[in-house]
Amino acid sequence: FNTAMEMTNTMGFCLSCHEMKNNPYEEYKETILFKNPSGVQVTCADCHVPRPWIHKVVRKIKASRELWYKATGKIDTDEKFNAHRWELANRVWDSMRESDSRECRNCHSYESMDLSEQDRSARKRHSRAVDQEQTCIDCHAGIAHEEPDEPEDSSQ
């Protein structure tokens, strides 16, 4: 069971769905998470799959909805995928808020930030975020993928 679950954490598995390869992956390749001076590459699972086992199982169960969407044709073309991006992105963002951006905090923490090394804007925003108990995704929603446009009818 664990072996199969870990196989679904690979970049290859994530990209086996052409909607992921043609859309989010192409955006991700243009970010610092993909290519950077340190050579540390963040993968899909680093941001989208929790490390604690029980949270990982819950995420995998929730991911079955995305597979269902693919199988039933709801997001089986680029056009359909993009039509549902707002809904899909908000699901991810809501989950990250609920977990206090747990996956971000696997690598980042306010306590480890050297604010004096940040530019004035980042220093100010990070200090305010700590004071206001904000979580990473509140400011960094577009860090790995383009933020989708909110639909005219935001009840979607």
Model-derived segments and spans:
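Short sequence/structural segments immediately N-terminal
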Residues: 1-156
